[in-house]
Structures are given as C-alpha cells and as structure tokens.
Amino acid sequence: MKKSKCVRISDLIPKRDPIMKIVMKFGGTSVGDGKKIRHVAQLLKRYHEEGNQIVVVTSALGGVTDRLLENARLASTKGKVSLVKEFKTELTNKHHGAVRDAIDDPNVAKEVLQILDIRIEELEKALIGICYLGELTYRSIDYISSYGERLAAPIVSGAVRSLGVSSIEYTGGEAGIVTTSDYGNARPLEKTYELVLKRLGCRLDSHVLVVTGFIGENEDGIITTLGRSGSDFSASILGAALKADEIWLWKEVNGIMTTDPRIVPEAKTIPQISYAEAMELSYFGANVLHPRTIEPAMREHIPVRVKNTFDPEFPGTLVVAEKFQCRHVVKAVSLIKNVALLTFRELKWQGQSGLWQGSLQHLQGQE
C-alpha cells in the first residue's frame, strides 16, 4: 500500500515573490540621532511590508567616527585615563539618548542598551591600553573607528524591531565581508561574495538585516576598515554578493545634481547616469559617489540609486551600466577647489633649455 505524503497547510498557500531585493545604505546624516533613526526604521518597515527583501547598511551616528579617532590620538599622545573616562560618558549619553528617541518598546530598548554598554566597555579598555602603550597603530585605528558603526547597528535594528518587524544586526565580518589586511584601506577578498550569500541569503524573507558599514575583518578575524566612503562600498559589496535588484544610497540630497546646489541654487537632479559618468564626476570633485564604491555593483550590473532620506518619494538618480542619452549636451559641472594650473612655455634660446624641468624640481620640494 502506497503511503500518502504529508502536506503542510503552509505549502498550499502560494508564496508571493518579493517585489525587489534591495540593499539600502544610510549615511551619518540619515542616522545622525535617535529621531532620524526612528524615521529610517519607519521607512524600512514600509518597504519590508510591501514585500521587498531588505538589507540595511548603517554608518555611525553623526560625528561619532571623528570623535573616536580624536580620542584615540589623545590617548596615544596624552596618556590620560581620565580623558578616556570622560569620552566614555559622552559616548554613552549620546547613544543612550538615541535609544530613548528611536525605540518605544521597553524590552527592545533594554536589550539594545545592554549591547551598547558591553561594546562601550570594550572600547574603554582598548583606549586605556593605548594610553599605557603610548602608540596608535593602523590596526588599532581600525579597531577604534569600527565602534561608530558597531554602536549604531543595534539601535537601527532595535528601532525596526520596536515597530513589529523582525530584524537581526551583524558586523561586516559576521555578514561575511573578509578583506585584505591593509588597515584603513582594506579590499574584499573573492570569498566574501560566497560567504555573504551563505550567511544572509537564507534570512532575507523574514527579517530586515542590519549590517555595519565601513568595516570587515581579515582572514584572522581582525577588524579592518574599507577606507573613504566605506559604508557605500559595504553596500555595493553586499548588493553584488546577494544579486540585489538595486542598491540604494540614502543621503541628504535628491540624488546626483547637475552641479553643487550650495553654489548654484538652480541645480537639478540628474534622473539617470551611467557608471562611467558617475565615476568621472567623482574623480573631478563631485562628492556623492566615490569611484571605488560602485565597482562591485558594476561587476554584477546592479543599478545604484541615490535617494534623499528626508524626501523618500523623490526617485533620485539611477546609476546604470548604459549611458543615458540626455537632450542636454552637458549633464553636470563639477568643481575642484584650491587647484592651481601652471603653464610653462619654453623658448629654446641658447642656454635656456631645461627651464621647465628645473622649475618642476623646485616645486617638488614645496608644500
């Protein structure tokens, strides 16, 4: 007699495909304090409930990374444990205040505060160690600066959970970002892409995943940082690994502008631009995207969208592989400040040859 197959009720319910798989990065302005984190959490809840699979990359709270680096340098030069204690109080007050403003659920808030206190204690010990050693290595700088994101991620994840959405927080290393040991400017190893997919891919359907931007770890498990625009780079790495539909970089501007709106108020948003054009603008002074940021996205042909956290309905700028034909001849104008252009015109009179070589040799020794 043939045995009947057991069928679960859940198997009979048609599964809805996610609308999109999106990696969203929120910068320091977007998560600057608890009220802004609450706003971010509400955005994430909305996109998640629409059926999207969401991975969040968070930067540190506003100004925290600079203060971490400043106090690390003070610890190495002044060696005063009292200054470390003062900084610990400052950091605790800032992040506890953010929890109060971002998280309503008292049980979630309690859990997050416990995580923060443990991490701040770890940081304090590291800074006191630097006081006694009187030196600050590149490895130590990476370790200290990583705490900005490592303190922000639990608050962002907690704010999402406080709104009734399941969320898990990861450090970059826990998410699978394995890098070279070039402290301060590490690069992801090829194994990163497989590890990220293995560790995060299975949880995308049911959770909003929050990952620290800017940091990874080397093959020995030591914390590394990804350098300038590291959180954008983290988002691009995760997006490439997870084969995301889009990578969204949430900033305080309405996308990539035709020029700097602080200089030209009439500047407009560029609706679409190619990877190559975006990289060229970055090289020539536009600060919205760092060229290295979009390398992993380019590898998988994943569109990168630049959006405004505080105007979320605005579509922003979409950065894609193909060049978008625009009716305007010039798409954008960028500016590099404090650059001098020297023109040498050498008249080859007798005894005057080599003038420009001598001039350049002289300039080489100047600041």
Predicted regions, residues:
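Acidic-aromatic/histidine active-site loop/patch
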Residues: 297
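Nucleotide/pyrophosphate-binding catalytic subdomain
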Residues: 3-294
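Active-site proximal loops enriched in glycine and acidic residues that flank catalytic Cys/His/Asp
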Residues: 251, 306-308, 345-348
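Surface-exposed amphipathic alpha-helical tracts and adjacent flexible/coil segments at the periphery
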Residues: 289, 300, 312-317
